[in-house]
Swiss-Prot record:
GO terms for molecular function: 4 iron, 4 sulfur cluster binding; heme binding; metal ion binding; NADP binding; sulfite reductase (ferredoxin) activity; sulfite reductase (NADPH) activity. It comes from Shewanella baltica (strain OS155 / ATCC BAA-1091). InterPro entries: CysI (IPR011786), NiRdtase/SiRdtase_haem-b_fer (IPR005117), Nit/Sulf_reduc_fer-like_dom_sf (IPR036136), NO2/SO3_Rdtase_4Fe4S_dom (IPR006067), NO2/SO3_Rdtase_4Fe4S_prot (IPR045169), NO2/SO3_Rdtase_4Fe4S_sf (IPR045854), NO2/SO3_Rdtase_FeS/sirohaem_BS (IPR006066). One of its GO terms (cellular component) is sulfite reductase complex (NADPH). [4Fe-4S] cluster binds at residues 429, 435, 474, 478. Alpha(8)-beta(8). The alpha component is a flavoprotein, the beta component is a hemoprotein. Component of the sulfite reductase complex that catalyzes the 6-electron reduction of sulfite to sulfide. This is one of several activities required for the biosynthesis of L-cysteine from sulfate. It comes from the Bacteria. This is Sulfite reductase [NADPH] hemoprotein beta-component. Pathway: Sulfur metabolism; hydrogen sulfide biosynthesis; hydrogen sulfide from sulfite (NADPH route): step 1/1. Disulfide bonds: none annotated. Keywords: 4Fe-4S, Amino-acid biosynthesis, Cysteine biosynthesis, Heme, Iron, Iron-sulfur, Metal-binding, NADP, Oxidoreductase. Its cofactor is siroheme; [4Fe-4S] cluster. Binds 1 siroheme per subunit.
Amino acid sequence: MSEQKLALNEYLKTDSDYLRGTIKEGLDSAVTGSFSDGDQQLIKFHGFYQQDDRDLRNERKEQKLEPLYSFMLRARVPGGICSPQQWLGVDKIASTLTSSNSIRLTTRQTFQYHGIPKRNLKTIIQDLDREALDSIAACGDVNRNVMCNPNPVESKLHEQAYAVAKQLSDHLLPHTRAYAEIWLDEEKLLSTEDETVEPVYGKTYLPRKFKMAVAVPPDNDVDVYTNDLGFIAVAENGELVGFNLTAGGGMGSTHGEVETFPRLADDFGFIKTEDVMKFAEAVMTVQRDWGNRVNRKRSRLKYTIVDHGYEKFKAEVELRAGVKFEPKRDVVIGDRGDRYGWVEGVDGKWHLTLFIESGRIKDLPGQTLQTGLREIAKIHKGDFRMTSNQNMIIAGVAAEDKATIEGLARKHGLLGQVLTQTRGHSIACVALPTCPLAMAEAERYFPEFIDHIDALQAKHGISEQAIVVRMTGCPNGCARPFAAEIGLVGKAPGRYNLYLGASFEGTRLNKMHRENIQEAEILAELDTLFGRYAVERDAGETFGNFTVRVGVVKAVIDAAKDFHG
């Protein structure tokens, strides 16, 4: 591979002085609202992407103006937990320093801001820092935000799992001081030897993004098998004893390029809790050294495992960790949804899960979600937990405070919505107008689409059945559409590829059923299938399993061979 020309990003990273580039100079320039092409790649490591309003792109071009550039900043919040005080700071930033005046909960248990002008970036990062929050490594070719099941029922086990997720996040952060120097005005230290700057990542970091999740069975809301590296908690007598390790998952693909495909992770075996950091670092460094740095479309860990082989990869990980895998332990992987409403934990505290459609927290007529969460944060004594289904848990509520919290939630439209089983299990990415990769709508259209799905389920008498439905504006897969029982992936404005056949639990991918079709065709197809499902399903059979059993689509067993075939 050394004889081949590397991907451009590899040269950018090498020459960036550990992610500094010319970001500071670009930030100081008032000539444009943009950064240079090279710095646009480097700023991802600092937690944000350059975007523009695509709804206004043609109009501004006609006016001979540059695109209306803005930035999306994503925070690093391992496990999705923040304090009410932190949330008040997060809310204030959204209300005063962004044009969207909203907060977007993501599918990886954090939040992001849209519509940030370049001049406000530094202020926002400094304001986040005052709340002990940051955006380091929220994007870029590094370990991203580490997910962990909120699981507020098993509080003790959750806290143990969360501690591991937090440790993973902290241990695998980049060591460069570029973030602190550029955004927090820290003085630059004298240059040191390369290997001491980034002992794990090295000068070129990873070949591509790297995603981790910690799952606490039976819940699988973190979609553990869709991650590069997963840790499935194993408990004995309610105490965490270790994890089943999974590796090689990832959703992204490219339309029309069969060498790219989504993939679910492989099971590698059981590891003890004290060995988690050894194995995490081992998997990451194998990917660092073996991953494809020539073709970024084939650079995720899933392709490294496919190209080198499972056994070879496993042996190298064991060698670097200095520990061998034990046989995986039996665990039950179940529901990927959230528990809406009040749930009592084993510690006697109560937890209120609020449905936030597509994760968008914004004040609208009759539904003042942002104000509601702000008012709750002012009085709440527990914490806020963001879920990977883009929802919010008001966690750790004392019994005597329940009525007050619930009253505020109802007053501001955070409770009381008509929520079907399917809507509660469905998510969408942002897509248009801000995402530069989007080929079709997702977040703005998704609520209307789910209305149609709800109506079809009611028509056929299957409203009680939860169906996992996900929509993205492109095949990069941010809302994990290839692990949905019904997946819609944007192909062109108003057109989507329809995927069917994933398992309800997230242990099998779906497969394309129809390509490049419009809403009417999608709904007609689902109308027919829902009719069959209502009559022909076995007792307890989920929709995804049904579509495979009756031959609507073939089961994807080996994604490298089956997904496109």
